[in-house]
Amino acid sequence: MDKATLTFTDVSITVNVPTGTRIIEMSEKVGSGITYGCREGECGTCMTHILEGSENLSEPTALEMRVLEENLGGKDDRLACQCRVLGGAVKVRPA
């Protein structure tokens, strides 16, 4: 199985993850400060700032783009419950 690296800068932890892993799944396990509510991409609570590696994430869905816009997300923000790590290295922090 292919792997990727995911770094949570707020807790200074880097983990190897299988490709396809959602950011929120590992955030919970490592104790990152990324909060969440619905886990369905509708509330915007898990907005996360992508510091590096956005090209290694799944494309945002129409729902994710709408929720980010409604919650004033910036160009480097994503919903941790929606985006999946596809490979390479990704570095994130709570938004």
Swiss-Prot record:
Residues 2-95 form the 2Fe-2S ferredoxin-type domain. The keyword Hydrolase does not apply. Its cofactor is [2Fe-2S] cluster. One of its GO terms (molecular function) is metal ion binding. Coiled coil: none annotated. Gene3D superfamilies: 3.10.20.30. Transmembrane segments: none annotated. [2Fe-2S] cluster binds at C38, C43, C46, C81. Pfam families: Fer2 (PF00111). Keywords: 2Fe-2S, Electron transport, Iron, Iron-sulfur, Metal-binding, Nitrogen fixation, Transport. Binds 1 [2Fe-2S] cluster. Signal peptide: none annotated. GO terms for biological process: nitrogen fixation. PROSITE patterns: 2FE2S_FER_1, 2FE2S_FER_2. The keyword Iron-sulfur applies. Ferredoxins are iron-sulfur proteins that transfer electrons in a wide variety of metabolic reactions. This ferredoxin is required for nitrogen fixation. Belongs to the 2Fe2S plant-type ferredoxin family. This is Ferredoxin-4.
